[in-house]
């Protein structure tokens, strides 16, 4: 089976935690690689963002990234990308025509890609599944200071995708409810496929590994360390963590507390690193906070291992892959009781869930684990068992089962008028 994956606005080659690259990048790359291991062939079409990028990049046996030229390489924000939908679609069609390619199924990611896939599905006369990752109707319910509302045009485009895709793939049952409440949808056409973690790469560390990770970061071995990994946008709540940390430092004057924030700026609003550094300075905790640039997975392992607990004070998360990665390394997670985080964290066993983003409530939850070694250690021991339920291999198997359950398209249809790759 040959799959055309569409990821217009962000490439699986980009470093997660920077710009618009995040969990979706991790999701696409890992699922594509696992699908290939199951015998499928996957081409991932994305927009070229650098002039020296090769048109085709091999990710491994059976997986390619196709960099399609659509507009200038640099200088376009995600909000401006809808102006390049036609150009991107044309590049996809030109590539497939030039190389005589055909596919059995299209899997699009995010609403921009869904608009492209909608046209390609009719041109190629093949099945189309779509994973939204985020939804305008949900994001607009969780705006933070300085954030812009998602435009009505996006919500309209998402409704068109919901109406026309053969199957809409979501991460959790909670997301099924989001689609049903925010859009006119047919539940029978929504499938739940849970994401995963690279449980071979993210593994529990030994006591020595933790010591080495802390020494490399210049953190005292006796410190209580709170980790944060993700894009620095207010939706992710790094400001909430800093405010909670200030309360903890005042509450536990004899406890050496340190905060590690690993990630880069993204999105709109007051999320730039400088703003967070200024906030730490205003709170009087700048000496206890370290800001780290985004790191590849093999280096993220040591960040998780250096932490006693990982905090995810997000206003909303469709799932929260960081929670799985942290737990896979044996680090408990404190997360907001919202969206997919309610499934990603086993409350009371691998971590704690907090209602909302009140800094005092977050200080209480974090303080509970930092001050109770027995509870924290018990959660650290259980966390990898919980994360092991969510491997990328299992995700890929669910996807293959879904792909193969779809009936083939009738022979007479759009493909009769528009062969694959033709724009006639």
Curated annotation (Swiss-Prot):
Pfam families in UniProt: Glyco_trans_4_4, Glycos_transf_1
Keywords associated with the record: Glycosyltransferase, Magnesium, Metal-binding, Transferase
UniProt GO molecular function: acetylglucosaminyltransferase activity; D-inositol-3-phosphate glycosyltransferase activity; magnesium ion binding
Role according to the record: Catalyzes the transfer of a N-acetyl-glucosamine moiety to 1D-myo-inositol 3-phosphate to produce 1D-myo-inositol 2-acetamido-2-deoxy-glucopyranoside 3-phosphate in the mycothiol biosynthesis pathway.
Assembly, per entry: Homodimer.
PANTHER family associated with the record: D-INOSITOL 3-PHOSPHATE GLYCOSYLTRANSFERASE, GLYCOSYLTRANSFERASE
Record protein name field: D-inositol 3-phosphate glycosyltransferase
Source organism (scientific name): Corynebacterium urealyticum (strain ATCC 43042 / DSM 7109)
Gene that encodes it: mshA
């Amino acid at each position: 089976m040959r799959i055309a994956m569409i990821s217009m606005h962000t490439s699986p080659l980009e470093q997660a935690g920077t710009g618009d690259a995040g969990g979706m990048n991790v999701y696409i790359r890992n699922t594509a690689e696992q699908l290939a291991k199951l015998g499928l062939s996957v081409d991932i079409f994305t927009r070229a963002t650098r002039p020296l990028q090769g048109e085709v990049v091999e990710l491994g046996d059976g997986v390619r990234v196709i960099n399609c030229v659509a507009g200038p390489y640099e200088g376009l924000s995600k909000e401006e990308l809808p102006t390049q939908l036609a150009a991107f679609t044309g590049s996809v069609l030109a590539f497939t025509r030039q190389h005589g390619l055909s596919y059995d199924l299209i899997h699009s990611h995010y609403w921009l890609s869904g608009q492209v896939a909608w046209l390609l599905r009719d041109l190629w006369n093949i099945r189309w599944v779509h994973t939204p990752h985020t939804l305008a109707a949900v994001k607009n319910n969780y705006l933070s200071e300085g954030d812009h509302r998602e435009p009505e045009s996006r919500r309209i485009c998402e409704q068109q995708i919901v109406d026309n895709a053969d199957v809409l793939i979501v991460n959790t049952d909670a997301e099924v409810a989001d689609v049903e409440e925010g859009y006119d949808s047919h539940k029978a056409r929504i499938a739940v496929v849970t994401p995963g973690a690279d449980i071979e790469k993210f593994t529990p560390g030994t006591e020595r590994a933790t010591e080495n990770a802390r020494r490399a970061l210049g953190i005292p071995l006796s410190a209580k360390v709170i980790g944060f990994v993700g894009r620095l946008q207010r939706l992710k709540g790094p400001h909430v963590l800093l405010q909670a940390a200030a309360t903890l430092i005042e509450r536990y004057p004899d406890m050496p507390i340190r905060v590690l924030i690993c990630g880069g700026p993204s999105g709109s609003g007051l999320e730039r690193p400088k703003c967070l550094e200024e906030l730490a300075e205003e709170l009087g905790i700048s000496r206890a906070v370290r800001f780290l640039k985004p790191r590849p997975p093999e280096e993220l392992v040591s960040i998780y291992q250096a932490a006693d607990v990982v905090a995810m004070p997000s206003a909303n998360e469709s799932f929260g892959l960081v929670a799985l990665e942290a737990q896979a390394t044996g680090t408990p997670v404190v997360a907001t009781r919202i969206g997919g985080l309610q499934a990603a964290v086993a409350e009371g066993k691998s971590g704690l869930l907090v209602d909302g983003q009140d800094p005092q409530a977050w200080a209480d939850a974090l303080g509970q684990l930092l001050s109770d070694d027995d509870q924290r250690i018990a959660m650290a021991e259980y966390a990898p068992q919980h994360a092991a339920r969510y491997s990328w291999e299992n995700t890929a198997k669910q996807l293959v089962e879904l792909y193969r359950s779809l009936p083939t398209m009738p022979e007479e249809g759009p493909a009769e008028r528009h062969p694959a790759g033709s724009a006639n």
